[in-house]
Amino acid sequence: MPGTEAGTKIAFQEQINRADLSVIFAEELKISELMEKLPAQSGGFQTPGQMNTSSSSRSPSDASGHWASSWINEVIQYGILEVGPDGRFYPDETITRAEYAMAVQRLLVVATRDNSLEVRYFGESPSRFSDVPSSHPAYNAMALCSERGIMQSDVMTGKFNPTGNIDGADALLIIRTLQNSLRMTF
């Protein structure tokens, strides 16, 4: 069950886009509250997502005036979703299962301060998914989400379906599982 009005609207969508994912992370996961509760990190090595949290970033041109612009800016600020090299966010672009897993991975790296989470599963042999080689750019994120019970492959086929869409209900279930993983109660 969604915890917010925005989550309720997204729950009924057949597929979610980058703007919807921004709203889910900001409203349902309460990313700002989560980040405020984390202890300050000392200097040293930072992942690309962590570097984004300390830099001042401008709002992407295609997010300005978008209905979800404040939520988009929030997930960009924390490095959960990124702006493309062209400076655009593409808020209406559909999110795939692989992209969702990548966003979850970035959050887990920032929340746990465990940089090894970004590379822990690359090169596994054999691949844990029948449809994804362990050399796939998002393999590590998919394996991390699967290992932690946040996202699962198909029980019958073993396929993760990285290019498949995520509907609103599944997106919210993933967020609830992620909240439980982080032991969050908001």
Model-derived segments and spans:
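N-terminal propeptides
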Residues: M1-F186
